[in-house]
């Protein structure tokens, strides 16, 4: 199975790549959409300067495609970017790090369907606390690259996600999504066993 991974450099996209490899799939490249502005509907923007390094560490060629901002435009640009590489890369599918966002998963599935590609979200509906704890226990160095929700201390930006910070996220009265799936925070993986 030859797959293209949507890669942001965050914990979920990196874990999705490693999960796909664990299934025996050939992850042939990473694809990063580069929105015109920072307020993208679907795509992770804080790590754009670092994602090349993440791809290099993963041993993946990185494909970058410009992306207009807007609910429809982002999906159109994703589809155009994938369509442009489908044949040259002999793709069978797309891999994403979607955890719980129906918004993302459905749109990626529609793109795959229209292009005749299978879509995989190997982390979909994982038990979030266990998932995050397993990454931390496995030695992943995950940094907060953006804090966007009230209640999460802004000084965590740039800091490491630790078991203590994960516990604090779980206890917060404002109840941000513990994995940041709604954009409450964004992450960058600096190191992982892979």
Label the predicted regions.
Residues 1-194:
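Nucleotide-activated chemistry modules centered on ATP-dependent adenylation/adenylyltransferase
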């Amino acid at each position: 199975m030859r797959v293209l991974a949507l890669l942001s450099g965050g914990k979920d996209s990196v874990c999705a790549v490693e999960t796909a490899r664990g299934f025996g799939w050939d992850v042939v490249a990473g694809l990063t959409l580069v929105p015109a502005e920072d307020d993208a509907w679907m795509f992770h923007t804080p790590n754009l300067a670092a994602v090349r390094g993440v791809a290099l560490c993963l041993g993946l060629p990185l494909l970058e495609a410009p992306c207009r901002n807007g609910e429809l435009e982002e999906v159109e640009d994703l589809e155009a970017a994938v369509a442009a590489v489908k044949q040259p890369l002999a793709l069978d599918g797309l891999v994403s790090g979607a955890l719980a966002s129906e918004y993302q998963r459905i749109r990626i599935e529609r793109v795959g369907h229209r292009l005749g590609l299978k879509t995989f979200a190997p982390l979909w509906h994982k038990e979030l606390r266990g998932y995050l704890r397993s990454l931390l226990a496995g030695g992943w160095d995950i940094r907060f690259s953006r804090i966007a929700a009230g209640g999460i201390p802004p000084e965590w930006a740039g800091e490491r996600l630790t078991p203590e910070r994960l516990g604090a996220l779980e206890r917060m009265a404002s109840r941000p999504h513990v994995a940041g799936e709604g954009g409450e925070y964004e992450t960058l993986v600096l190191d992982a066993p892979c």
